[in-house]
Amino acid sequence: MEMKGLKNIRKQKNYSQLKVAMDLSISRESLSYYENGKRSPDINLLVIFSKYYNVSIDYLITGKEFEKK
């Protein structure tokens, strides 16, 4: 599953893949795989990404914030 918001938020914050990977103690290659849908992060890692970027898990997956109806 491609993580549209994961790549978008990293680019919005002008963070390199290397910076994020080092901050979160994961490999840059793994981050690239997550961003491009070659691998899916487990729920624990999604929570870590969500806290790191201060965005919802919905945003990380879809690239859109959850909208209340």
Please identify what each model-predicted range represents.
Residues N8, Q12, I61-K69:
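Short, charged recognition helix plus adjacent turn
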Residues L6, V20-A21, L31-Y34, L60:
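Conserved hydrophobic/aromatic packing and binding residues within compact polymer-binding modules
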Residues K7, L18, E29, I43, ...:
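Residues within the helices of the helix-turn-helix
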Residues I26-S40:
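Recognition helix of helix-turn-helix/homeodomain-like DNA-binding domains
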Residues S25, N44-Y59:
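DNA major-groove recognition helix of helix-turn-helix/homeodomain DNA-binding modules
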Residues K38-K51, K64-E67:
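Short, basic-rich loop-to-helix N-cap that marks the start of a DNA-contacting helix
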Residues K4-D23:
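Short basic helix-loop element that most often maps to the first helix and adjoining turn
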